[in-house]
Regions:
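Surface-exposed loop/turn segments flanking beta-strands in extracellular/periplasmic regions
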Residues: 1-15, 60-79, 123-152, 242-266, ...
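Outer-membrane beta-barrel transmembrane domain signature of Gram-negative proteins
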Residues: 63, 74-175, 229, 241, ...
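Surface-exposed extracellular loop regions of Gram-negative outer-membrane beta-barrel proteins
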Residues: 25-104, 159-191, 195-210, 275-277, ...
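Extracytoplasmic gating/loop element in the C-terminal half of outer-membrane beta-barrel translocons
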Residues: 14, 69, 146, 187, ...
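Conserved small-residue
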Residues: 126-128, 322, 339-431, 462
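Outer-membrane beta-barrel signature, preferentially recognizing the C-terminal barrel domain
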Residues: 17-20, 144-165, 231, 251-292, ...
Length: 584
């Protein structure tokens, strides 16, 4: 640390030598009990019950000597200790009857009926104290008190669900296939008047290669057409999203005790978010079983959507869950696998898959207008008819004016201006890739094995949050802190500079624009493995029959068109592991 007439500078390595710690301890218990009774050859009864309990404790201590507390003159505000405790208790169970029989050697019938129930419970408590005289005493008992206006917190939540289902499958001569599924699901997440919903699906299949007319066609060993339609439900929402919740207001006591305020309005008519899912595809194997291809086209229509809508300030809450509009998603998936070498002692294959999809909003209500207006200067997401959930909305930018160092914008009429106006917002990108998937290869030779899988992402854009926060939008005080070097070297400084970032002398807030949106193409080493398995005679001397050694690497590299700092996020994890297995 050193000082000059302008400011005080801190070495970020100084805090590393202080007594700081953050640790998390987790314990868990899981038990599953299952009963399986085959009453007769065709009838089977199964029951299962599972219980999971876990406890997690987080402790975090910040030394009073850390530089973050240098601005605090009162010792009661220096140093802090935080503790959070979470207890989870979950159970689930199901009961089913299964019947399957082949009639007249051509009619295969399978019927499954049953029910399932579950409960997810969570208990959370936390507190934070401050004021430590010395970092040798990190026990919270040595703290001088709670944070100003800070209290201990406590939350208890439960989510329950129950479902009843009936599945029917029929196959005629292994050529024509039919699957019918029906479910009735209930969940405490949704409104008391709409807690149950019915979901269904129907699937058809045709094994063309089983037909008599196909027997003369050589080179194709399997050809199957598939089609399905159904409406699966979605209950991945907050436990009490539809329930009115009151919070005790301990800051305003009266003669009757503590007051209560509404923290969640709830909605007793809140419906399940339903999706009509349609799919058609085919499977084919040919070239002497060397090439396998699977193709699917899907179309998903979600109606209604479940959206948090902004409310008037007089209600006392910021948002209210409502069912609004529709979303249509369609796309394709393709998987291919080709066996280049296929021998008893050697095998080599290559594989690839890809996915492409687009989404669009339909019949979006005007109630989302306030949401769009409130989020103009916060993010790039908007709800508009015909828009996509992954569209990036911003004002178009022509870059930095070399003469003045100011940003030049394009309005909706295509004219250049120095004035940023949110009414000129247009779609400047889409966060979804044009296509993404995995390409890989597998090799085996006399006990040696190797596999490589690379994940790719082509097309799509990303908002450069680090550039927006750490290179521009810097206050006068932050200019003296440790910053991205581009905040100093890549800014406009004098007339004629061809700079990517605005004038270094400007401290005005930079609005969101397309200047911070870049193409995001990625290639990463998703998984790489090497192994060797041996059944050598010498293993018998130690009583073993086989031995295997393997090495695994996950996300070992990442190549991207985006050069972006991770900020406060964790770096991309690169893991390397080894395993040794011996079979006796």
């Amino acid at each position: 640390m050193f000082q000059n007439y302008a400011a005080t500078y801190y070495n970020p390595l100084y805090d590393m030598n202080q007594t700081n710690f953050e640790e998390t301890k987790t314990t868990g218990f899981t038990n599953n009990f299952e009963v399986d009774w085959r009453v007769i050859d065709e009838l089977r009864v199964r029951g299962r019950f599972g219980l999971t309990k876990s406890n997690e404790q987080m402790k975090k201590f910040r030394s009073p000597f850390n530089t973050e507390f240098n601005s605090q003159a009162d010792i009661a505000n220096k140093g802090s200790y935080e503790e959070r405790n979470t207890q989870n208790l979950n159970y689930d169970g199901d009961f089913s009857l299964t019947y399957g029989k082949l009639f007249n050697e051509k009619h295969m019938v399978n019927v499954v009926g049953g029910m399932r129930l579950s409960q997810n419970g969570s208990n959370n408590s936390a507190y934070k104290v401050q004021g430590f005289i010395d970092d040798e005493f990190s026990n919270p008992a040595f703290a001088l008190g709670y944070q100003k206006d800070g209290n201990a917190t406590y939350q208890d939540s439960k989510k329950r669900a129950v479902s009843y289902y009936l599945n029917f499958g029929y196959a005629y001569d292994d050529r024509y296939l039919l699957d019918v599924n029906y479910r009735s699901d209930g969940s405490s997440v949704f409104g008391s008047d709409r807690q149950f919903t019915n979901t269904w699906s129907v699937g058809l299949g045709w094994n063309i290669h089983k037909e008599a007319f196909f027997s003369d066609i050589e080179g194709i060993s399997l050809l199957k057409l598939r089609a399905s339609i159904g409406n699966p439900g979605n209950q991945n929402f907050d436990d009490y999203i539809s329930t009115r919740i009151y919070t005790y207001n301990t800051d305003n006591m009266n003669i009757f005790g503590s007051s209560a305020i509404v923290s969640n309005l709830g909605n007793r008519n809140l419906e399940w978010q339903k999706t009509l899912d349609r799919n058609i595809g085919f499977d084919i194997i040919f070239l002497d079983n060397r090439l396998r291809v699977n193709f699917d086209y899907f179309n998903k229509r979600t109606d209604p959507l479940l959206v948090q809508i902004g409310t008037a300030s007089s209600t006392g809450v910021k948002t209210l869950p409502r069912n609004v509009g529709k979303q249509i998603t369609e796309g394709i998936t393709l998987t291919m696998n080709y066996s280049i070498i296929r021998r008893e002692d050697m095998f080599w294959s290559v594989n690839m898959n890809l996915r492409h999809q687009t989404s669009e909003y339909k019949e979006v209500s005007e109630v989302l207008t306030k949401y769009n207006l409130d989020n103009r200067n916060r993010n790039l997401t908007r709800y508009y008819d015909g828009g996509s959930p992954s569209d990036l909305w911003a004002v178009r930018s022509c870059g930095i004016d070399p003469a003045t160092g100011r940003e030049i914008f394009l309005d909706k009429n295509g004219e250049q201006t120095f004035v940023h106006n949110y009414d000129d917002e247009v779609v400047v990108g889409n966060s979804d890739p044009k296509v993404e998937g995995v390409i890989g290869t597998s090799f085996y030779y006399k006990g040696f094995s190797a596999s490589i899988n690379l994940r790719y992402r082509l097309g799509g854009q990303i908002f450069m949050q680090t550039l927006y926060d750490k290179v521009e939008n810097l206050s006068s005080s932050k200019k003296w802190e440790n910053l991205d070097k581009r905040a100093l070297y890549d800014r406009w400084k004098q007339p004629g500079d061809q700079a990517k970032f605005k004038s270094i002398a400007s401290s005005e807030v930079t609005p969101i624009s397309s200047r911070f949106v870049e193409d995001n193409n990625v290639l990463s080493g998703e998984s790489i493995s090497l192994g060797y398995e041996s059944t050598a005679p010498w293993l018998k001397h130690i009583g073993a029959s086989s031995m295997s050694v393997r090495a695994y690497m996950n996300d070992i590299f990442r190549i991207s068109t985006v050069k972006n700092e991770r900020g406060l996020s964790y770096p991309f994890a690169r893991s390397v592991s080894f395993s040794l297995g011996v079979t006796f």
